[in-house]
Amino acid sequence: MNHQQQQQQQQKAGEQQLSEPEDMEMEAGDTDDPPRITQNPVINGNVTLSDGHSNAEEDMEDDTSWRSEATFQFTVERFSRLSESVLSPPCFVRNLPWKIMVMPRFYPDRPHQKSVGFFLQCNAESDSTSWSCHAQAVLKIINYRDDDKSFSRRISHLFFHEENDWGFSNFMAWSEVTDPEKGFIDDDKVTFEVFVQADAPHGVAWDSKKHTGYVGLKNQGATCYMNSLLQTLFFTNQLRKAVYMMPTEGDDSSKSVPLALQRVFYELQHSDKPVGTKKLTKSFGWETLDSFMQHDVQELCRVLLDNVENKMKGTCVEGTIPKLFRGKMVSYIQCKDVDYRSDRREDYYDIQLSIKGKKNIFESFVDYVAVEQLDGDNKYDAGEHGLQEAEKGVKFLTLPPVLHLQLMRFMYDPQTDQNIKINDRFEFPEQLPLDEFLQKTDPKDPANYILHAVLVHSGDNHGGHYVVYLNPKGDGKWCKFDDDVVSRCTKEEAIEHNYGGHDDDLSVRHCTNAYMLVYIRESKLSEVLQAVTDHDIPQQLVERLQEEKRIEAQKRKERQEAHLYMQVQIVAEDQFCGHQGNDMYDEEKVRYTVFKVLKNSSLAEFVQSLSQTMGFPQDQIRLWPMQARSNGTKRPAMLDNEADGNKTMIELSDNENPWTIFLETVDPELAASGATLPKFDKDHDVMLFLKMYDPKTRSLNYCGHIYTPISCKIRDLLPVMCDRAGFIQDTSLILYEEVKPNLTERIQDYDVSLDKALDELMDGDIIVFQKDDPENDNSELPTAKEYFRDLYHRVDVIFCDKTIPNDPGFVVTLSNRMNYFQVAKTVAQRLNTDPMLLQFFKSQGYRDGPGNPLRHNYEGTLRDLLQFFKPRQPKKLYYQQLKMKITDFENRRSFKCIWLNSQFREEEITLYPDKHGCVRDLLEECKKAVELGDKASGRLRLLEIVSYKIIGVHQEDELLECLSPATSRTFRIEEIPLDQVDIDKENEMLITVAHFHKEVFGTFGIPFLLRIHQGEHFREVMKRIQSLLDIQEKEFEKFKFAIVMMGRHQYINEDEYEVNLKDFEPQPGNMSHPRPWLGLDHFNKAPKRSRYTYLEKAIKIHN
């Protein structure tokens, strides 16, 4: 327990009393002493290190500070005078400082009693908050007379920044420790001892490669079980060699699973740091969500090896995976009384072993090959011999070199309707002889296996942590692979500690146990674990992976240096041609020439670089930065190369990044002759852009730009405009100034100067002109002003078919001033249908999908429908095509139900009865939508079904408004059979029949109504049921029949029972309860619906 929390708890009123001295024998987990951190200096005491439990396997390095365990002592002198906490000097384990903390503990409610507080502290002086280290420890007060009488307690704790000490505030009564007769104190000295075993720490500079020779894998999310599997496959060296040899030269780097696996294996072999797996999971074609879905390691192993095996076909390593992992077994059924036997040989790549109720792996194998007796109701159908008593079992023909054993730790619990984890103890040996389970043994090659990998899960069915213990070279020297951290461990930690089950030793947690084992055949050990050297990796693969690394390093460097650079986007004048909107170009469609420029470089340096890149001398180019104006437009502005040449780019751009510049150049046809750009006087000249509008084509034509003095009159520009547009001189023109979106002003007076004719004259102003032609009045948009107004209201809308999931739809350009009918007419033309046969739906604001339907008399505009969309968000509406006019359709309601056809098959249909109608109207609509049987009554009925049972038949005059839909109920329409049209209510009855298997609450299948007669023999009822369900006699013999009432069932004696209608009537006084029903008890052969959500869907590799 962390002692700071302990002190805080004791300060609260009404705290729980701490254990008295006689309670000292309780387990560490039985006390809730919470902890606190003090950093008092060591005031007295000495530390002694002892070899204790040290293991020669562990001490791989000379530097003992990296060891995994240690025993150290701390002697506190003048113990009787101890008044505050004391700390021992540090003992380094896993390169972290561990200290003994001792303190006297006083209790406000018991001032004459105190106890000894004893804690283990880890890494307390570190400023880091990200470190953690799990450890187990034995805390002991030494008895100097008899060590066997020393007092000890165990702890197991995850040490981290917030809880960096753990132990007991009432470890032992003060009076016992200081009693000379007890043997704990000698000359006022008490010796405290700690034996600590620590896992490799996380969040600190742990060098896995240095301490083990291997590196780990980064944890990518809920796929950490995948890390365990990948390490297991990596250390199957023969497989690793084969993966390297797969030809991947032409593979897509992002989609090739073999290449991604080669990459992971190569980095595990050569990297000094943990290796990432994101490229591998990306190659699987996984969605974002997929990589966080907890799955069974067997499932991923099988799918991954299948994928690789298929891609090895036709290569030099074809057959490697079957050679390593495939075994053969035979499933047999042997009849006892007739000469009949059925054998089926099959391959397997892993074996699933049941562990429930089994002590060890041998008992599981015995259970796996145990003979099952097929007798009684479970006899075997031996064809012409009929049902026979038989024996069923499996025998192993061969066992593979690499044996994957899946321990069934996770099982379905029918009581809770979910999977549970079995944490029972289950033992497995380091050496596993399996000859006794083979049908035929080979004396020259006994089936003796060596344990190679132990895959371990800590936690429950809902989640937890995965690690793998590996014996990489098969020599008994084990390592623990915990995601990115790899550490050496003892054989005991790898094997015995992962048996599972309860253990008094807190170093083994109850929920931590093995779920998969990998054994390698002893005779194949050297072959499977053959050394993999650089010579086994194709040179072209090495070069490709190294080039990838170089590119990644370059990109990483660019990201690190990105703050030093800015982007300059150059737009040339040819990008203005063809633009049909406001300003000079569409920012989403324009093609820029992008330069990466140092922010502190000068304009002069950039112009020089730009000149060289674009191939124009500096006197043939001029830069015009695109400047955002206050009215929302973006126009070119003057940049003085001479005056601003020494200014930095970031200064000139006013921190705009990317910075867009219009690059003016000499006409390329004149550039070769040495022509230069005309002079531009920034104080007296202005640059204007010209557009010509053609009302006949409703289009704009870019007519270039001009320099002109500010004092120039509008009339002086008319000849230039006529020339640029290809009009004859003196053509009468109408001129407009394009001010901003939805504001285009006509220029009335051509005899005034530019600064008076144009509003706030600036460089980059746009003049739009058109012919003054009376024929323009016949055009839909006769003037440029109307064109720009229409453009302002123009909107692209995506229309998606509501009835098609994920329909991409089609785009229609509309005006947001359109009303409902105008929109419907436009969409109907696109769909080649009648506007009245369309219904439209708004888009839901909170998610992508159809919302409420629009009525055909909607009075708003398209703008009103789209007002909640964000500016750059795609505008979307939904539609569905109708079979009746919308005016009629809106007076009807949508009614989803099931139609049961004459072949006793169900199909879902949607009907549209009058919303104020009754069941009769619904049935009439159904007659129009379905095909009735030839030999039936032609009359329909509406049933209500809950949990696969019919709970009622609705009367024809019942209002549809009373039928409320719900997820728990289903409405079904069916044709009334001829024998059920007229019922003799005195002697006959319609009863509900439903299917179940063993439990009446587990109904399934299609329920139905059946006519029965008072006094008829039940065999007659059975014949009608068999005929209706069209079941073979042999299958029908397995059915049992029961009368079910109030959740209880009573089986019918088929040979004796005669129908009594009272058995199917509600109990007197309980008319509100459902009627009894006839249950058909038989096995459900239909595939069960998945119990699981999307998060538990089957794993799949898509590439």
From Swiss-Prot:
Alphabetic keyword roster: Acetylation, Biological rhythms, Chromosome, Cytoplasm, Developmental protein, DNA damage, DNA repair, Hydrolase, Isopeptide bond, Nucleus, Phosphoprotein, Protease, Thiol protease, Ubl conjugation, Ubl conjugation pathway
Compositional bias per record (Low complexity), positions renumbered to this chain: 1-11
Gene Ontology biological-process annotations: DNA alkylation repair; monoubiquitinated protein deubiquitination; negative regulation of gluconeogenesis; protein deubiquitination; protein stabilization; proteolysis; regulation of circadian rhythm; regulation of DNA-binding transcription factor activity
PTM entry text: Polyneddylated.
Residue intervals of the MATH domain: 69-196
Residues with the N6-acetyllysine modification: 870, 1085, 1097
Domain USP residue range list: 215-522
Region of interest (Interaction with p53/TP53 and MDM2), ranges: 54-209
Chain positions of cross-link Glycyl lysine isopeptide (Lys-Gly) (interchain with G-Cter in SUMO2): 870, 883
Phosphoserine modifications at: 19, 50, 54, 964
Changes seen on gene knockout: Led to early embryonic lethality. Show disorganized germinal layers without the formation of a proamniotic cavity. Many of the surviving cells were trophoblastic giant cells with large nuclei.
Tissues where this protein is expressed: Widely expressed. High expression is detected in brain, bone marrow, thymus and testis.
GO molecular function: cysteine-type deubiquitinase activity; cysteine-type endopeptidase activity; deubiquitinase activity; K48-linked deubiquitinase activity
Enzyme Commission number: 3.4.19.12
Annotated stretches, region: Interaction with TSPYL5: 1-209
Enzyme class label: hydrolase
Catalytic activity: Thiol-dependent hydrolysis of ester, thioester, amide, peptide and isopeptide bonds formed by the C-terminal Gly of ubiquitin (a 76-residue protein attached to proteins as an intracellular targeting signal)
Location(s) in or outside the cell: Nucleus; Cytoplasm; Nucleus, PML body; Chromosome
Family note: Belongs to the peptidase C19 family.
Assembly notes: Monomer. Homodimer. Part of a complex with DAXX, MDM2, RASSF1 and USP7. Part of a complex with DAXX, MDM2 and USP7. Interacts with MDM2; the interaction is independent of p53/TP53. Interacts with DAXX; the interaction is direct and independent of MDM2 and p53/TP53. Component of a complex composed of KMT2E, OGT and USP7; the complex stabilizes KMT2E, preventing KMT2E ubiquitination and proteasomal-mediated degradation. Interacts (via MATH domain) with KMT2E. Interacts with OGT.
Name listed for the protein in its UniProt record: Ubiquitin carboxyl-terminal hydrolase 7
